[in-house]
Protein backbone atom coordinates (compact mmCIF):
# COMPACT_ATOMS: atom_id res chain seq x y z
CA UNK A 1 0.00 0.00 0.00
CA UNK A 2 1.25 3.52 -0.73
CA UNK A 3 1.51 5.46 2.52
CA UNK A 4 2.25 9.16 2.90
CA UNK A 5 4.31 9.94 6.01
CA UNK A 6 2.41 13.22 6.42
CA UNK A 7 -0.61 11.14 7.46
CA UNK A 8 1.30 9.63 10.38
CA UNK A 9 2.65 12.67 12.23
CA UNK A 10 5.65 13.43 10.01
CA UNK A 11 5.91 17.08 8.86
CA UNK A 12 6.69 16.03 5.31
CA UNK A 13 4.86 14.72 2.25
CA UNK A 14 6.68 11.46 1.63
CA UNK A 15 4.86 8.75 -0.28
CA UNK A 16 6.35 5.27 -0.16
CA UNK A 17 5.15 1.81 -1.15
CA UNK A 18 5.02 -0.31 2.00
CA UNK A 19 4.55 -4.06 1.61
CA UNK A 20 3.70 -6.24 4.59
CA UNK A 21 3.59 -9.99 3.97
CA UNK A 22 1.35 -11.89 6.35
CA UNK A 23 -0.64 -15.10 6.09
CA UNK A 24 -3.87 -13.54 7.33
CA UNK A 25 -5.16 -10.01 6.92
CA UNK A 26 -3.10 -6.98 7.90
CA UNK A 27 -4.54 -3.59 8.78
CA UNK A 28 -2.30 -0.64 8.00
CA UNK A 29 -2.14 2.10 10.66
CA UNK A 30 -5.00 4.59 10.76
CA UNK A 31 -4.16 7.96 9.26
CA UNK A 32 -4.21 11.09 11.40
CA UNK A 33 -6.56 13.91 10.47
CA UNK A 34 -4.27 16.78 11.39
CA UNK A 35 -0.99 17.41 9.60
CA UNK A 36 2.21 18.46 11.35
CA UNK A 37 3.57 21.64 9.76
CA UNK A 38 7.12 22.79 9.07
CA UNK A 39 6.88 25.47 11.77
CA UNK A 40 6.06 22.81 14.37
CA UNK A 41 9.23 20.91 13.52
CA UNK A 42 11.75 23.68 12.86
CA UNK A 43 9.97 26.91 13.78
CA UNK A 44 12.57 27.67 16.42
CA UNK A 45 15.38 27.76 13.83
CA UNK A 46 13.90 28.59 10.45
CA UNK A 47 13.97 32.39 10.85
CA UNK A 48 17.54 32.66 12.06
CA UNK A 49 20.99 32.08 10.64
CA UNK A 50 21.84 28.76 12.25
CA UNK A 51 25.43 27.71 12.86
CA UNK A 52 26.39 25.27 10.14
CA UNK A 53 23.76 26.49 7.68
CA UNK A 54 24.82 27.65 4.26
CA UNK A 55 23.54 31.04 3.10
CA UNK A 56 22.94 31.23 -0.62
CA UNK A 57 25.05 33.81 -2.41
CA UNK A 58 23.36 36.28 -4.78
CA UNK A 59 24.84 34.25 -7.67
CA UNK A 60 23.30 31.04 -6.32
CA UNK A 61 19.94 32.75 -5.84
CA UNK A 62 20.10 34.00 -9.43
CA UNK A 63 21.03 30.53 -10.68
CA UNK A 64 18.14 28.94 -8.76
CA UNK A 65 15.66 31.50 -10.08
CA UNK A 66 16.81 30.83 -13.65
CA UNK A 67 16.71 27.06 -13.11
CA UNK A 68 13.19 27.19 -11.68
CA UNK A 69 11.98 29.45 -14.48
CA UNK A 70 13.49 27.31 -17.27
CA UNK A 71 12.20 24.09 -15.75
CA UNK A 72 8.75 25.63 -15.20
CA UNK A 73 9.14 24.78 -11.53
CA UNK A 74 5.78 25.14 -9.86
CA UNK A 75 6.91 23.69 -6.55
CA UNK A 76 10.29 25.10 -5.51
CA UNK A 77 12.15 23.65 -2.55
CA UNK A 78 11.51 26.63 -0.29
CA UNK A 79 9.97 25.52 3.00
CA UNK A 80 6.71 27.16 4.01
CA UNK A 81 5.93 27.36 7.75
CA UNK A 82 2.22 26.60 7.38
CA UNK A 83 2.59 23.50 5.20
CA UNK A 84 4.28 20.12 5.48
CA UNK A 85 7.65 19.95 3.72
CA UNK A 86 8.13 18.37 0.32
CA UNK A 87 9.83 14.99 0.20
CA UNK A 88 13.35 15.03 1.59
CA UNK A 89 15.83 12.85 -0.27
CA UNK A 90 19.58 12.46 0.01
CA UNK A 91 19.88 14.22 -3.36
CA UNK A 92 17.89 17.34 -2.49
CA UNK A 93 19.32 17.71 1.00
CA UNK A 94 23.00 17.81 0.14
CA UNK A 95 22.65 19.44 -3.28
CA UNK A 96 24.73 22.53 -3.92
CA UNK A 97 21.99 24.79 -5.20
CA UNK A 98 18.99 24.13 -7.38
CA UNK A 99 17.34 21.13 -5.77
CA UNK A 100 18.06 21.71 -2.09
CA UNK A 101 15.52 22.48 0.60
CA UNK A 102 15.88 26.02 1.88
CA UNK A 103 14.34 28.54 4.25
CA UNK A 104 13.72 32.21 3.64
CA UNK A 105 15.27 34.44 6.28
CA UNK A 106 13.52 37.66 7.41
CA UNK A 107 16.13 39.77 5.56
CA UNK A 108 15.28 38.07 2.24
CA UNK A 109 18.31 35.80 2.06
CA UNK A 110 17.81 32.06 1.75
CA UNK A 111 19.78 29.28 3.37
CA UNK A 112 20.01 25.55 3.05
CA UNK A 113 18.46 23.61 5.90
CA UNK A 114 20.82 22.01 8.40
CA UNK A 115 21.18 18.32 9.12
CA UNK A 116 19.26 18.77 12.38
CA UNK A 117 16.40 20.58 10.61
CA UNK A 118 16.27 17.83 7.97
CA UNK A 119 16.26 15.21 10.72
CA UNK A 120 13.37 16.93 12.50
CA UNK A 121 11.42 17.07 9.22
CA UNK A 122 11.94 13.29 9.04
CA UNK A 123 10.68 12.98 12.67
CA UNK A 124 14.04 12.06 14.21
CA UNK A 125 14.33 13.23 17.83
CA UNK A 126 16.99 15.87 18.57
CA UNK A 127 19.00 13.41 20.65
CA UNK A 128 19.56 11.11 17.65
CA UNK A 129 23.10 11.39 16.29
CA UNK A 130 24.16 10.76 12.71
CA UNK A 131 27.69 9.71 11.80
CA UNK A 132 30.07 10.80 9.08
CA UNK A 133 30.57 14.07 7.28
CA UNK A 134 27.83 16.49 6.24
CA UNK A 135 27.05 14.72 2.96
CA UNK A 136 26.96 11.31 4.65
CA UNK A 137 24.62 12.64 7.33
CA UNK A 138 22.27 14.16 4.75
CA UNK A 139 22.34 10.83 2.89
CA UNK A 140 21.38 8.92 6.06
CA UNK A 141 18.54 11.35 6.75
CA UNK A 142 17.26 11.45 3.17
CA UNK A 143 17.32 7.67 2.74
CA UNK A 144 15.63 6.91 6.05
CA UNK A 145 12.10 5.76 6.70
CA UNK A 146 10.70 8.45 9.03
CA UNK A 147 10.87 7.05 12.58
CA UNK A 148 7.25 8.02 13.37
CA UNK A 149 6.00 6.14 10.32
CA UNK A 150 8.19 3.13 11.16
CA UNK A 151 6.91 3.17 14.75
CA UNK A 152 3.26 3.24 13.67
CA UNK A 153 3.88 0.41 11.20
CA UNK A 154 5.61 -1.58 13.95
CA UNK A 155 2.61 -1.11 16.25
CA UNK A 156 0.27 -2.34 13.49
CA UNK A 157 2.49 -5.39 12.89
CA UNK A 158 2.62 -6.11 16.62
CA UNK A 159 -1.16 -5.86 16.84
CA UNK A 160 -1.52 -8.29 13.93
CA UNK A 161 0.71 -10.85 15.61
CA UNK A 162 -1.09 -10.52 18.93
CA UNK A 163 -4.41 -11.48 17.34
CA UNK A 164 -5.39 -15.16 17.39
CA UNK A 165 -4.39 -16.77 14.11
CA UNK A 166 -6.51 -19.04 11.97
CA UNK A 167 -5.32 -22.46 10.91
CA UNK A 168 -4.69 -23.20 7.24
CA UNK A 169 -7.98 -25.11 7.16
CA UNK A 170 -9.93 -22.15 8.55
CA UNK A 171 -8.38 -19.83 5.96
CA UNK A 172 -9.32 -22.08 3.01
CA UNK A 173 -12.91 -22.66 4.19
Identify the residue ranges that each predicted region occupies.
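Class I S-adenosyl-L-methionine
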Residues: 1-81
Amino acid sequence: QVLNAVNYGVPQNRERLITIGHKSSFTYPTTELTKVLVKEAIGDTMNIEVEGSKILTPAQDKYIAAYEEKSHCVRPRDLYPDKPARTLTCRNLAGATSDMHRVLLPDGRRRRITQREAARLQSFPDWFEFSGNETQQFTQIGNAVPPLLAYKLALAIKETYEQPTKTDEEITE
